[in-house]
A protein has these predicted regions:
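Core AdoMet radical
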Residues: 1-5
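Catalytic cores of alpha/beta
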Residues: 7-20, 77-78
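Auxiliary Fe-S-binding modules of radical SAM enzymes
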Residues: 21-106
Length: 106
């Protein structure tokens, strides 16, 4: 669960994911906080969560890379909301934040 003031920094998430791996637990999901009464102070906007997760690319191994998800209100299931790297114009965003042509890979 991504929580404001608890684990809403790249350093905190990196330490958490590394500690989980050291305990032989794969960080499978990073949940976006559900909108519920009394939780507003812990809310991290989705765009900020995406930026945080993207900033960990290259800092942690793929095993420590969870799927950032949103549990759709109303019981409609979970959907991945992680950072997007492939753009509709055929470019990809690299770990350095710059954009490159995906070339013939599309």
């Amino acid at each position: 669960m991504l929580l404001r003031g608890v684990n809403d920094s790249a350093d905190a998430l990196e330490a958490l994911f590394r500690a989980m791996l050291a305990a032989r637990v794969k960080p499978y999901y990073l949940h976006q906080l559900d909108a519920a009464p009394g939780t507003a102070r812990f809310h991290v906007p989705i765009a900020e969560g995406q930026r945080l997760l993207a900033s960990l690319r290259g800092r942690v191994t793929g095993l420590a890379w969870p799927t950032y998800i949103l549990d759709i209100p109303g019981g409609h299931g979970k959907v991945p909301i992680g950072p997007g790297y492939l753009n509709t114009d055929g470019t990809v965003r690299g770990p350095d934040g710059r954009y490159y042509s995906a070339g013939s890979s599309l």
